[in-house]
Amino acid sequence: SDITQVPANKRDMGFVFQNYALFPHMTIFENVAYGLRIRGLSGDALASKVREGLAMVGLGNAEQRYPNQLSGGEQQRVALARVLVLRPKILLMDEPLSNLDAKLRLHMRTEIRRIQQDLRITCLYVTHDQKEALTMSDRIMVMNRGRIEQVGTPMELYEDPATPFVA
């Protein structure tokens, strides 16, 4: 359905930015709790959801730390937890792994895919990394200069590329 007339704060979607966009003056707990507080959650219900979100991304022991005390991978997981506790229908991710080293990127690909499947969230994942796209996606849209070249499963794109660019 068309949501263009729905205010952004009323749309049931989450966004994980390339730079994570964590609040540096807030603890990890407070960062994850932020969206829940905006929605009116407080007390034990809020604490429970925050702890569940941090456990989901393997950071249950980091809630009193600050973003500058975490590695890039840990910060990325906090940004993911902050969105996931809201249980959005759609999750938009803009190159969330681009600032990570190769080993951590591989690990986080697996983690993001696992969480996305466990929670059954539709995810629109923007990447320039072919391996990321092929390993994390059910369907891929390949774009070239703002135009769609092909849409299909990873296998369809790999076995039957529609254009030389897709190949």
Segments from the language model and where they lie:
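ABC ATPase nucleotide-binding domains
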Residues: 8-14, 18, 22-165
